[in-house]
Amino acid sequence: MIGPPWLAHVASEEAILCVERIAWREGKLDHEPIPMDYSVIPGCTYCNPQVAAVGFTERALKEKGLKKGTDYEVGKFPFSALGKAIASAHTEGFVKIIRGLPRGEVLGAHIMGDQATELIAELSLARRLEACTRRRWRPRAASSTRKCVRL
């Protein structure tokens, strides 16, 4: 075992990476494999309500010596303010995003509520791509669907 996080999909990726590195060292792969970035792997708890997270917590950033307001900021949004949550009667929960300053890259994200384990995927990808939250992300799934229906 390599170590945490002890998740089946992580173990599968580690095994594939191991085989790729062996193949690369033997000259059977034309590029060096990209190392795993464990900070972009979401953790999901399939309970009710669901809980999901990716990246750093505020505590971890403070332990690294980063300061809230100077190095990062935190935004939190309740499910109770989302139209979809109201329509589906699943208003319990929130989304919390920790973004770096000054760029606005996603340092961490935490979701508690209905479909949290699905919603975390977009924030995991944003973290992986170092997407800047200061820009509006387009297209969003809902706007894409709406535009397709108009065609």
Each model region followed by its residue ranges:
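Anionic group-transfer/hydrolysis microenvironments
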Residues: 2, 15-16, 98
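Generic hydrophobic secondary-structure packing signal
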Residues: 7, 11-14, 118, 122
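Short, flexible active-site loops
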Residues: 1-4, 38-46
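Active-site metal-coordination segments of metallo-dependent hydrolases
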Residues: 5-9, 55-56
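Flexible, glycine-rich terminal cap/loop adjacent to redox cofactors
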Residues: 26, 41, 46-151
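Internal hydrophobic alpha-helix adjacent to the cofactor/substrate pocket in enzyme cavities
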Residues: 9-37, 66-71, 130
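Flavin (primarily FAD) binding-site architecture
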Residues: 2-5, 21, 122-123
